[in-house]
């Protein structure tokens, strides 16, 4: 009886645990193909309003490409303080609409209005802070850890970046992971991140 129970336990461990870990690994991850499909359909707002885990290569590629285009080599800096009675005490910094202090070379207020966050919640990355990190080449450091990004910043970067890459093509995520390098949905093939993509998705 003990031998039989042990055998059943081994079988459960062999088959159930890998499946459980696989589901943990892929749950709520938005793939490149899924993002592009959502951008193309105009449904991006739906995913940026909720907590979503984005694979690092997608997030990094979109943010680096988008903000490098906007930077144009200029110096962007976040003064690291909030306004106090409408005043910033760091030299060269001024108070923005969201009670955050920015350097004189930061983006104009008209751009900030769309993307900055009013909240000073811990770990929120503002537009100025992102651009500073992108400019310094340190983007890898923030995409490897849990970071709260304001929805307008994320939406702007992803929509802008992926709309450039889409070119009107049909993008679809096959909704399955590769199994032994194979995808079983017709017209789908295995990509670099062990996820299946349709024929018209971006080249991996």
From Swiss-Prot:
Residues 23-72, 106-118, 119-167, 201-204 form a propeptide. Residues 1-22 form the signal peptide. Disulfide bonds join 79-93, 83-95, 88-101, 174-188, 178-190, 183-196. Proteolytically processed in two steps to yield first two linear precursors, and then two cyclic peptides after removal of the N-terminal repeats (NTR) and short tails. GO terms for biological process: defense response; killing of cells of another organism. SUPFAM superfamilies: Cyclotides (SSF57038). Keywords: Cytolysis, Disulfide bond, Hemolysis, Knottin, Plant defense, Repeat, Signal. The keyword Transcription regulation does not apply. PROSITE patterns: CYCLOTIDE_MOEBIUS (PS60009). The presence of a 'disulfide through disulfide knot' structurally defines those proteins as knottins. Belongs to the cyclotide family. Tricyclon-A and tricyclon-B are hybrids of the Bracelet and Moebius subfamilies. Probably participates in a plant defense mechanism. Has a weak hemolytic activity. This is Pro-tricyclons.
């Amino acid at each position: 009886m003990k031998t039989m129970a042990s055998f059943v336990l081994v079988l459960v461990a062999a088959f159930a645990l890998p499946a459980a870990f696989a589901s943990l690994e892929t749950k709520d991850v938005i793939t490149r193909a899924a993002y592009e499909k959502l951008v193309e359909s105009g449904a991006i707002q739906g995913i940026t309003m909720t907590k979503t885990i984005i694979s690092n290569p997608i997030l990094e590629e979109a943010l680096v490409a988008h903000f490098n285009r906007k930077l144009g080599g200029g110096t962007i800096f976040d003064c690291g303080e909030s306004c106090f009675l409408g005043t910033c005490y760091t030299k060269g910094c001024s108070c923005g609409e969201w009670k955050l202090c920015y350097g004189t070379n930061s983006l104009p207020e008209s751009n900030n209005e769309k993307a900055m966050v009013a909240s000073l919640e811990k770990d929120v990355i503002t537009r100025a802070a992102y651009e500073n990190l992108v400019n310094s080449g340190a983007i890898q450091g923030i995409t490897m850890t849990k970071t709260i990004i304001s929805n307008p910043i994320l939406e702007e970067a992803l929509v802008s970046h992926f709309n450039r890459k889409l070119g009107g093509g049909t993008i679809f995520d096959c909704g399955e992971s590769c199994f032994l390098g194979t995808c079983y949905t017709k017209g789908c093939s295995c990509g670099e991140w062990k996820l299946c993509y349709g024929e018209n998705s971006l080249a991996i």
